[in-house]
A protein has these predicted regions:
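Peripheral, non-catalytic segments flanking oxidoreductase cores
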Residues: 1-325
Length: 325
């Protein structure tokens, strides 16, 4: 297995000097190469304070260590018929071996009737009863990751077009469908599945992500692997407690007309308890995944979908989003 297959990109100069600085082109080229050839890279010196990540991890543990009877109170209707949500909230480990908590944009409120009338928009559960600081901690981290996503996305846009305002068009809060997810892997006794390709025991099945990109933090090495698109060989993603793992999603593949492809990844079975926190950076529901936004003029290979329709179709393959009508 090749060492250093996943490149690390130091964002310090981009964070300090901005997207229009003399340093942005060099970093843009690094991101372009990693995204086009591999679909995964890590970033360090990303501007998100590590103390905020530590506080978030502690808050996560506090929630997941609650009795199941408490957590299920904020589960979607599939597990708790007394709640109003279908997607947002807690899902138990019976789904796919891990517990989870899905949180949407905290800027979405009950008085935004036009948005919450749509199937994909739900106001987050009030969890201040668990911790008075919960809402502040979650909102603050969501903002940090949204801003980091915007910085990386604008850097990607700059590879193809000078029109960086496309990012502002694509990500109009609270119209975005971005999701902050907490994954809690308890000490697992058996794998989720056995890989049909190489017989390896898995804690999370092989898949690609749907959004523009995913920004992932892991509290410890969790067995994340990436598949080489050409050789089909699997490579470990190195763990760094000061880094985020970035992977390009299917929406970015559509938007770049196949230049930056979504990449298969999986998680090896691991009996050690751990937490991972992916932020699925997803655009406004009505944003069209049209390559012309990036000055890519050839005919789209995929057809042009608004993101809401695209996401609805993409999520059908994920068991945790299998919901009754």
């Amino acid at each position: 297995m090749q060492n250093n297959y996943i490149p690390n990109i130091d964002l310090s100069k981009l964070v300090s000097n901005g997207i229009n600085s003399q340093y942005s082109k060099e970093i843009a080229n690094q991101i372009k190469k990693a995204s086009e050839e591999i679909g995964f890279f890590t970033v360090t010196n990303h501007g998100v304070p590590l103390t905020k990540i530590d506080i978030l991890l502690n808050t996560c543990r506090k929630f997941f260590y609650l009795p199941e009877s408490e957590k299920i109170k904020i589960a979607p209707k599939k597990w708790n018929p007394h709640t109003e949500t279908v997607y947002r909230g807690y899902f138990p480990s019976s789904v796919n071996g891990k517990e989870g908590l899905d949180i949407g944009d905290p800027q979405l409120t009950h008085d935004m009737k036009d948005l919450i009338s749509k199937q994909t928009f739900e106001v987050n559960h009030d969890m201040s009863y668990l911790d008075p600081q919960w809402q502040f901690i979650i909102n603050d981290y969501f903002d940090e990751l949204h801003n980091l996503g915007m910085l990386i996305f604008k850097t990607i846009i700059s590879v193809y077009s000078p029109n960086l305002s496309v990012a502002d068009t694509a990500f109009q809060r609270p119209k975005t469908l971005s999701t902050l997810r907490f994954n809690f892997y308890p000490k697992q006794e058996r794998p989720v599945e056995i890989s049909a390709q190489d017989g390896v025991a898995l804690g999370c099945e092989t898949h690609v992500d749907s959004g523009i990109m995913t920004i992932l933090y892991q509290d410890k090495k969790g067995g994340l692997q990436v598949q080489n698109r050409n050789t089909l060989e699997w490579h470990d993603v190195p763990h760094n407690s000061e880094a985020f793992v970035i992977n390009t999603g299917l929406a970015l593949e559509y938007l770049t007309n196949g230049r930056m492809k979504a990449t298969n990844h999986r998680v090896l079975f691991n009996q050690e308890e751990r937490i991972s926190i992916p932020f699925f950076f997803e655009p406004s529901f009505d944003f069209k995944l049209d390559p012309k936004y990036l000055d890519i003029v050839e005919e789209s290979k995929y057809g042009i979908d608004c993101y809401e329709d695209f996401l609805t179709n993409s999520l059908k393959k994920f068991v945790e989003y299998d919901r009754p009508n």
